Each structure stands twice: as structure tokens, then as C-alpha cells.
Amino acid sequence: VGTPGAGEDWAYISSGTWSLMGAELKDGIATPAAYDANFTNEWGVAGSIRFLKNIMGMWLIQEVARMQDYQYSYAELADMAAKEAPYQQFVNVNDDRFLNPANMIEEFQAYCRETGQKVPETPGEIARCVYDNLALCYAVELKNLQAITGRKINKLHIVGGGSNNRLLNQLTADACNVTVEAGPGEATAIGNLVVQMVATSGFGDLASARKAVRASFDLHTYEPSNPDAQAIVEEYETFLANQCQLARV
């Protein structure tokens, strides 16, 4: 509700420890494709359906920072990552091995060794690996979301604490090939307030409430700027498919 979207051509990522990617629908979708892709239907405000998927989020970088005894802030890790070469590794960030490893850095390094890829070593390389692969993951799931809902998504709203990460926002715009609008960071609290105001006639409806949210907070827009990103997403999808086949052997 705290997401300042309008119309039907937008999706959202609630970006925190975990990422919730989805769209606001009028009716639920309970198809085999939705089941296979692990999307769920949740009741939303005013009879809407939040069609979404819970995927990996900032947990990865939180654990990377913890494993370095918080020597670097999240902003410093992002700055270091921005200076590194992009897309040096492909990682399935939704693999169960990243849910609660003893050491997140070592888990990423082990994954890269096992898959025959360059192993990230420095704090910047590790952070870049995390951010690149989160963005690639978002791109794959946005494709799934569009295929299942039949909607063409032109804008992706990123809300929550993760919306403050400018590097990840730009990487997401590039990988997803859509406009990304980031903010507000406190969308959960704002949404709670907005629903109460709609219920007490502070706003006439949800659409007017969302217009007020848009007018009340600084939002940052990111446009796709990497012409090679879509080819990289396709390579990433091939990598995931190959890893899935190997897991079945």
C-alpha cells in the first residue's frame, strides 16, 4: 500500500532482508505455472490480491558485512562493489545453501569453486558478486511474473530499506530492462498509516492515497543503461538451467 504505483503496468520489490516481488491483481492466479514458479496469492487491501514470490534479498550482504566484523558499512561495500568489474560470477542466490551458512563469504567462494568460476576474494569483489546476482535473480523472476500474469511491466517500484542501495537499483534497472523507481524506504509503516487514513476518510481511496505518498517522499528513478545486460541475463538463465539439470543427476 505504501508503494506509489499507478495503473496496471507496474510491479514491486519490497527490499529488505528478504525480497518480495509481485504485482497487485484483482483476482488470484492458481495455475500450474504459478505453482511451479512458487508464486503465492495473498489478500491485499480493498479486495486486491498481492501476487508475489519471496526471494533472496539483503540478507546476503548483511551476512557478508557481519563476517567482516562490520569493518565496512553497507554504503562502503556498495561503493567498493561499484569499482569492480561486473558479472564475473553467476550464482543461484536462491539456493538453500545461502539461507543460513556458517560463513556467507566462504559459501559464495565455495559455490564459485564448485561451478568452475572466478572466486571473489576482496570485499569489493564479494559485494559485487552479491549485487550482480541479486539483480539477475530479480530479472528472471520479473520475466516469470510477466509470463504468469500476462502483464507487460514497464516500471518496477523498489521500496523498503534496500531501496537506498543505488548500485543495486541501477543493476536491477539494467537487468530487468525497465524503469526502476526507488522509495519510500519506510513503505511498510507508510502503508499502515495510509490504510488507517483511507478507513477514516482521510483519503477517498487507495489511488489518491498513493498520489499523496508520491508527493510526500523523495523518489529516485533509474533507467536501463547497459546495452549488454539482456544478453547477460540470458547467459544467467542458461547457467541456472544447467545447474538444475546437474542437481537432478
Regions found by a protein language model. Give the residues of each.
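Active-site core segments that coordinate phosphate-bearing ligands/cofactors
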Residues: V1-K155, N164-T188, V194-V249
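Glycine-rich Rossmann-fold phosphate-binding loop(s) that bind the pyrophosphate
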Residues: G161
